[in-house]
Amino acid sequence: TDSQFITDDMEDTARQVISIVCRQLPLFSGVSITPDIARVTDNSKVTDHHAILPTVQLEKQDVSALPQSEQKILNLIGMRLLCATGEKHTYAETQITLSCEGYEFKTKGKTVVQNGWKAIEELFKSSLKTKEKDDPMKSLPEVHEGDMLDSVSASVTEHFTTPPKQYTED
């Protein structure tokens, strides 16, 4: 299914499943969240089938007895459910404009205020053997208006971009 929502009548089941995921899946055993089910509940956006969820039968299963590939799929589905209903990821974004010799230079940086659902996603990514390359969040040094920067080195570099390769049947 491509649906990312559940129906209103599934709210209690979703809460129960989230609790089971946090208890049964070793990867999420230390995770404690207060789920916001309302973010994934919308009858009008459910197409022919609701979003994929683990069932309450997970509670009766020995997850360690599952093949590794099935455990990975279950962890992925559990992670998506916890992220979708977890706390918001909030950050403060700062923009700095510097002027030098009549030229203006701008940069942006972010500071995480509350990691929220990103903590669950990072936990999942750290469990994978091949880690995805993620854009590291740029943190900026403490600067104030009017500060003078001495001995700043700079260089000019030339880079070329290429479009992503098109999908083929090969």
Q: Could you tell me what each predicted segment is?
A:
Residues 1-170:
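Core catalytic DNA strand-manipulation module of type IA topoisomerases
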